[in-house]
Amino acid sequence: MSCSEVFSRYAGASSIHSLSRLMIRRLALRAVAATALTLSAQLAHAGKTLDGVKQRGVLQCGVGTGVAGFSAPDNKGRWSGLDVDVCRAIAAAVLGDPEKIRFVPLNAQQRFAALQSGQIDVLSRNTSWTLTRDASLGFHFAAITYYDGQGFLVAKKYKVTSAKQLKGAQVCVQAGTTTEKNLSDFSRTHNLGIKPVVFDTFEAAFKALFSGRCQAYTTDASGLASVRNKEAPNPEDYLILPELISKEPLGPVVRRGDDEWFAIVKWTVFALQEAEELGLTQASVDQARSSTDPSVQRFLGVSEDTGKLLGLDKAWAYRAVKAVGNYGEVFERNVGAKSLLKLPRGLNKQWNQGGLVYAPPIR
């Protein structure tokens, strides 16, 4: 091989190497630019919800259309329930007043569109946390406020004592819910040939059971207790079957892209749960501000300012508990022993009492 041939080959290899390095540099610059654009978009959106709530002076909270124990208005139009109290706690933490709130009743078909469009700031409406909803709708599930499962309500006159006896039965169910899909899966798994009778609203579905249109009605077990005790013509004529056919972790939902607001909603729920573990109640929280317990001092903002990490002031957690009480109080008042539903705590007990409620440390 001549010197000229060697040089030619070397020059060609060198050119290819230089070109490769140039392409790598260009790709790297594009990646950096894309990352910068993403970060700038996130930063531009960060805090948008909190700013809007503060400017408006009102929290817009999406709730159910009338589920006793969770979200329902009384005859004077005042809302109450576990989901409602979560929103009141958020309003207290953010705006300093649990009454600075507008409740927006939404059915299952309306709820996600209302959140996506910005009609509401937070959705607190017995909504199950699933992979599909979490990954594809552009939402964050902030926390779990109630561990539930799907069950069945039947009229005792049908002599049904197990869900597996519902072969060929007409079962009332609400459209656009995980309940509808779970019913189909349960029917196929056990070869029951269940005939779903689908309704657009919660109310229409359970009323069809009472009118005799269906042999059973299915929804979350907590909802069944609500319907049986509050809506049935005679509660003693109806039975909640023992089987739960799904896991239904319920909790508040926010839009993706606003990490600050996501953190505020999440940590407000954790504050209610942590308050119960610390023994802080709605009645005792004022006196507790003079406590020498470091955990209590930190929680109430006496010794540390955790609120600045959330864009709030140091008394945010104090106000949330003062407004609605701790998680145990919220539970018992709305769905537990002090309510019409009389539901047991079950999985909704604190972690150190055999339940699943476990708040990360507020510190």
Task: Specify the residue positions occupied by each region the protein language model found.
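Acidic, polar ligand-binding/catalytic clefts
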Residues: 88, 92, 96, 100-165, ...
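Bilobed "Venus flytrap"/periplasmic-binding protein-like clamshell domains
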Residues: 60-69, 79-94, 128, 148-204
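Bacterial N-terminal signal peptides that target proteins for export
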Residues: 7-32
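N-terminal signal peptide c-region/cleavage motif recognized by signal peptidases
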Residues: 40-41
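Extended ligand-binding regions for polar small-molecule ligands
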Residues: 85-88, 92-94, 157-160, 164, ...
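Extracytoplasmic small-molecule ligand-binding "clamshell" domains
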Residues: 46-124, 310, 315, 323, ...
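C-terminal functional modules
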Residues: 309-363
